[in-house]
UniProtKB/Swiss-Prot annotation:
Coiled coil regions, renumbered to chain: none
Role: Histone-like DNA-binding protein which is capable of wrapping DNA to stabilize it, and thus to prevent its denaturation under extreme environmental conditions.
One term of GO molecular function: structural constituent of chromatin
Protein name per the record: DNA-binding protein HU
Similarity annotation: Belongs to the bacterial histone-like protein family.
UniProt entry keywords in alphabetical sequence: DNA condensation, DNA-binding
SUPFAM superfamilies: IHF-like DNA-binding proteins
One of the record's GO cellular component terms: cytosol
Gene that this sequence comes from: hupB
Source lineage: Bacteria, Pseudomonadati, Pseudomonadota, Betaproteobacteria, Neisseriales
Source organism (scientific name): Neisseria meningitidis serogroup B (strain ATCC BAA-335 / MC58)
PANTHER family xref list: DNA-BINDING PROTEIN HU (PTHR33175), DNA-BINDING PROTEIN HU-BETA (PTHR33175:SF3)
Amino acid sequence: MNKSELIEAIAQEADISKAAAQKALDATTNAVTTALKQGDTVTLVGFGTFYVGERAERQGRNPKTGEPLTIAAAKTPKFRAGKALKDAL
């Protein structure tokens, strides 16, 4: 399912226009992104939790030259599914 299909599904489920569904989806993704940037977690009870994970610095290798290099530590967005979502699958 891509974004436009999700918007259509939201519009049908909530009995609203596609434009309203798109605004709602955009507002939701913006709110989650903003919270994660601030280091917060976003928990939707039953659905799951969005949080920021930390990837440690590690050694890698340049595939072209074989030369070792250091890959910097990074923050990555993560999602942990909630019980209701797991049970639905």
